[in-house]
Each structure stands twice: as C-alpha cells, then as structure tokens.
Amino acid sequence: MTSFELNTAWYSLSAVLLLLCLSSVAAAEPPPVIDESMTSAVSNELELLKEEETVSIASRYEQPISQAPSNVYVITDEDIRQSGAIDLPTVLRRVPGLEIMQMTGGDFNVSARGGNQPFANKMLVMVDGRSIYGDVQGTVFWKSIPVTLPEIKRIEVLKGPASAMYGFNAFDGVINIITKSPEEMKGTTLQFGGGELGTISSAAVHAGTIGKFGYRLSIGRDQTQQWRDRDALGFRSNKFNLQTEYALSSTSKLQVSGGLVDTNRYDGQVGEVTSNSIRPSLAYANVLYEQGAFLIRAWWSGYTDNATITPNSQLVDLLSITDRNGQSTNPFSGNTYNVDVQHATNLWATHRLLYGATYRHNSLSSTTIDRFSREDRLGLFIQDEWRAASSLTIVAGLRYDLHTQITGTWSPRVAILYQPVEGHTFHLSGSAAYRPPTLFESHQDQRVTTTLPTGVPFPPSILSTVPISGSTRLAPEQIISYEAGYQGWYWKHRLRVRADLFFNHVSDLIGSRITSGGASEFVNDQGSADIYGGEAGIEFLASRWLSGFANYAYEEIGQSFSGTVKRGAPRSKVSAGLRTEWDNGLSGEISYYYVGATTYPIAQTFTTLATIPTTGVIAPGDRVDSYNLLNLRVGYRFWQQKAAAGYMRDAEVAVSVFNALNDEHKEHPLGDLIGSRSMGWVTVRF
C-alpha cells in the first residue's frame, strides 16, 4: 500500500472515529442556551422531517407521495448539503434503482433499472419543469446543470416510463430539480468548496422580495482535475442564472427566468471508441404564467459546442474521426423552442381531470451532419384520477405524440392505488414510453480513416476511409413496464418502509452497426430485453439528532440484443447512510454504497483490431469489478441569528471526503480509475 493510500485510509478512519465521538459528546452535553425563535425553528424543522413529502412529478400537479401513480423518491436540500457532494449524480446514488456511472472527471451517465451506458439518453431531466435534456443529441450534461447547489430545494425522481405525462424521452424515468423561491432563499448565500484535484465548487446567490415582486440571482464556478492525470484540467464551468416572479393575485403568478452555463473544459464524453473533449455552452429563457390549476409555459434553450473527437487512447494512432471536411474539431449549434399548456379540474366529487398539450421545435447545425436539420413535435395528453372508494384510487392517462420524423405514438399509463389503512399504500401500474431518434442519429455524416501498420518497409501502412451515417428510417425505441409496490409509515411517522417489484420489456434500441464495405450506420436492433427486479428500503428518524436510510436493489437482464446496445447493469446495489445534527451546531453524515460487478458490451472495433498483430491493440475487458464507496462529511454551524426580514442568518464550515476508503475502481471498462477526494467548505447566509 502506498503512503498516499495509508494517509487516506488513516484520514478516513479518523473522520469516522471523530464523528462517533462527537455523537456521544453532543448527545450527552446539555443544550446551549438559545432564544425562543431558534428553538421554534428547530422544532418546526423536526416536524417537517416527520411529514410525508408533496410531489408534482408524477401527475404534473402537487399530491402526497403515497398518492402518486408512479414510483417517486425525493432528495431534499438537506440531503444535498449533508452529502458534501460537488455534483448531483453523487447525490443521486442514494436513490434505489438509479444507476450512476462516472466515466471521467466531467462525464457522468445516469439511468434507471438496467438502462445505463456511455452517452446515456433515456432519462428525462428537468429544472422546475423545464427540460434540460438535449433533444438534438440525446444528452444531459450533468456537470453543467444551470443552477448552483444551494439554490436547489428538492429533487424528485420518478423511476419507470412516464411518456403518458411528459412525452418522448421519459423512457427510464424523470428527474425534476426544483429550486427555491425568492422568499425561501431571501438574503445572500455564499458557498465555497475547495480541495484535492484542484476541485472548486462555488456559488453566490442573492434573493429577495419587493412587494409582490420576487427575484433570485446566482453565479457559480466549478472545476476539477482529471482522474487519470491529476495535473490536467478535467472540468471547468461558469454559470449565471436569474429568476423573477410577480404575484398577480393570491392564485396567479408570472415568472420569467434565464441563464447561461459556459463550460470551457469538459473531459468527455466517452463513447464506444472515443474519448472526446467538448466545450458546451448552454443558455435558456423561460416564461411561465400560472392561474390556479391552469398553466402555460414557453421556453427556449440553446446549445453551442466545439467538440474535438478523439479516439480511445489505444486507437489514437490507428483511427481518425472527422467531419465531411476532414476536421476533427467540429462545431455544433442546437436550438429548442417549447410551449406547454395544461389545466386540471375536479369533475363531480370523485374525479380529477388533467389535460394539456406540448409543442416543440428542434434544430441542429453542424459539420458532422448531412444538412441543417429540424423537427417538430406535438403532444396531447389527458389523465383522470378517480377516487373509486375511500381506500381505492384508479389513475388512467393517455398521450398521443406526433413527430415529423416518425409515425405518431400512443403512451398509456394505468395505476391502481389501494390504502387499506391510513399510512399504508399498495400500488400496481403499467405504462409504455418511447424515445425518438435524435437529429444527430438521423443525419450523422462523419468519416473514419483507419491506418493499419503492415510491419514491412513498403508500404508501411494501409489507409482506408469509410462513412459513418445516420438514418431517417429509424423507429422510436420502446419500453413497456409493469410495477407493484408498497410504502408504509411506522413508529409515529418516524420510519418509512418501501418495496417495489418491476418488469420492463425494451425493444427497438438504436445503435451503430457496421454495414457492407466497413461503413457504419444507425439502425434499430432487432432484439429485445426483459429486465426485472426489485428495490426495498427504509428511512428513519431515530431521534432529534439521528436519522438514516438503507436501500437494496436487485435486477436481472434477459436479452437478445447484440453489439453495444446490449444492456449491462450490476445485479445488486446497496446504499445506506446515517446523519447527525445537534443544537450546538455540529453535524455529520456517513453514506455507504456498494455496486456489484457488471459486464458491459465493448465495440467491435476493439476486438477486430486486436486480431491484427501489428496494431498492438489489446481489447479491453468487458467486466468491471464491484466497488465500495464511503463518503463522509462533518460540519459545524458556528453562527445563527434571525434576520429582521424573518429568515435565519448562519455560517458553517465543513470537511467532506468522497471515496474515503480510496477503493480505486472503474465504473465502465473505458472509464477512468476513480479515486478519493477531500474537500473543505464554507457557507454563509446573511
């Protein structure tokens, strides 16, 4: 074991012992004398921890989580703060059934229930109901989320198909990042985190209200070095965000927001045979009007990039991937325009009807596609929530989506919720979803030049160039899902138990195939996959100062897919955590994650070139070993005071360690070796 590993292990052990000692001391020592307002604030926060969450992701309107017709999990702002994470995928690891794959210092893939892969494209991600999923390429830039971490109020995670509500791309599920209102974030919040690998996570947020007008302004800067080369920059971004809202009446409001994320270094994305270097800039503008149960939203998002397409390190001397002009650095420019309209109404005493429509226009310009491309989408949806009896609710929804590139699709969802006694709910559901081909998959136009050494003086090498093409004949990917589950409250709402079983049938996945003459083209794989399994977990509040969670997820995959569209996922995953927080300002969290060994498909390019002795290529193994991830955080809130405006001012310092055991591991055969990282944090709100 190296000195670095010894130091990291010793530091991790010391942090655990320190947290346990602090638990004993803080539990034993008498509480400090504090004013009544602080006591009231702590009491109110405790009561909130006992309450059932209200979510809006499942039905597009707010409802108790136990009444949601889909499987929903909530991550709070406290979960984010106490995690010590510098990015959201690290926080999302606690959600049972989600799969997180870190490829590099900048590149993450997030999916659910067996759907993860490089360039994962089957999870719809939104911020305040506005999609940040890049339709034109099927991409989510997880390190370039357009809000800072302190602005996030909660994250709602829906596992399973949700096209009945959200249309295309809600394939594996939906993640909605909900931000704090100007009233909730009133004042100025400054946060700075810095640590190993040149890591910086910083944010400055100012929010307030003036009469009926509210505003929130934020800036942020994030950066980190590469895992494989700790002296090389892996990611750096600057972000700006502004949200304003005006209360037109007690039941209506107008909201206008906009922002920009400029990423000047993004180590990734890692593809089947590439390890790219991209520099995406993401901008948006959003207008929302809400009047009671009626909502209309219009937004625009823009995407520009200059991406350098680089072959995998083993292939860099053998392959060259360029646009049709022979350039390996390619410009991209994409735009999305979207309008959503929805209305909910109560019919009689037992029905709640939701209906609405979505129109979207996408365009993409790049030298890597055959021409400037555009598409139009129109979706119409309706859902009825029928309270058939006091203990029985039936939810049925249907959506029809039109698309200029493919035939129309119908996406149904039916859910039955049975509550035999208060606090205990059983649910049974079935749904279907689609992911259409992206503009890039339909119109790709690139070239691959292969240089094969001969091993003789003349000719020293043989060159060949073949096209990589998209196809306008692609059908949408499809998933049909069935789920049964239970959630119940025990111990006076201090313990929640959840358990779910699922079965997914996946077909028509889009992948690249080598055709005659060595050319490559996107096609729909003729195979299919049946993915089934279950998840179980508990969340508990043991006392005012101790809470925790524990989850287990299991899945099996039977499939006839071939090539790189084959599904790969760990059979077993475990997540667990303990959190302590005391009146004297001390807090801490220990979270543990186990991910089982996994086999992922490797591109045929590697295996083909490995058979030619002169190339020196060794095909990567398709298996990644299991790994254990232990994350730690200890914090101390040394100042707290109630402001004249009614909110709490405070200041906190903290130390966090990612992968405290330094279990170096890969999460994909082509990914980097992930190590440990220690951070120091300062957060002030005034």
Model-predicted segments: where are they?
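Membrane-embedded beta-barrel scaffold of Gram-negative outer-membrane proteins
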Residues: 295-309, 419, 427, 459-466, ...
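Short acidic/polar hinge/loop motifs at secondary-structure boundaries
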Residues: 131-159
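Conserved C-terminal beta-signal and adjacent last beta-strands/turns
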Residues: 245-247, 567-686
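Flexible loop and strand-edge segments within Gram-negative outer membrane beta-barrel domains
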Residues: 224-231, 235-237, 252-336, 367-368
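Gram-negative outer-membrane beta-barrel transporters
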Residues: 354, 387-391, 498-506, 524-604, ...
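Periplasmic-side early beta-strands and strand-to-turn transitions of outer-membrane beta-barrels
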Residues: 163-164, 176, 184, 193, ...
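N-terminal Sec signal peptide and the immediately downstream disordered periplasmic leader
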Residues: 2-4, 16-85, 89-95, 250, ...
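Extracytoplasmic beta-strand/coil segments of soluble accessory domains associated
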Residues: 57, 64, 89-134
